[in-house]
Amino acid sequence: MSAGIGGHTSSDMRERFVSDVISKNGKVVSIMAGINDIAQNDGYISNADILNNIASMAEMAQRGGSKVILCSVLPANTIGWNPAIRPADLVIDLNSRIKAYAESHDCVYLDYWTRLVDENTKGLPAALTTDGVHVTDECYEIMEEMFLSTLKPLLK
């Protein structure tokens, strides 16, 4: 099941995490958050605070007995709805924080960024995005394959 809501930030996700995710008693919980924070959908928030929100959700899931997959933020070099933001370096920094947290807190890190990045632009390749942030069906297919190969061993 998916509990994602378009436009929500990590703070929004954290607020509804117990009712929307923990209450479902999933064996595995996947968390993908950060781009709407970087886009300042709710105003400025530091990468440290974004990570704190992600960590809070991961800890709630683990306390509930779920295994946790922490997904990287996808590559982005533009935010169409907030063009003043230059997200590429912020995404790279947040992903390094998420990865370090995952490695030190018994979570699995799913690195979409490395597989999907256009090294020249530090964003998504044009063929995989509709606007620099949101992905095409082709990109979803790549992500689905990566997600399922990460998920399957955790279900054993």
Question: Where are each of the predicted segments found?
Answer:
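Alpha-helical cap/lid subdomain in secreted, periplasmic
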Residues: 12-156
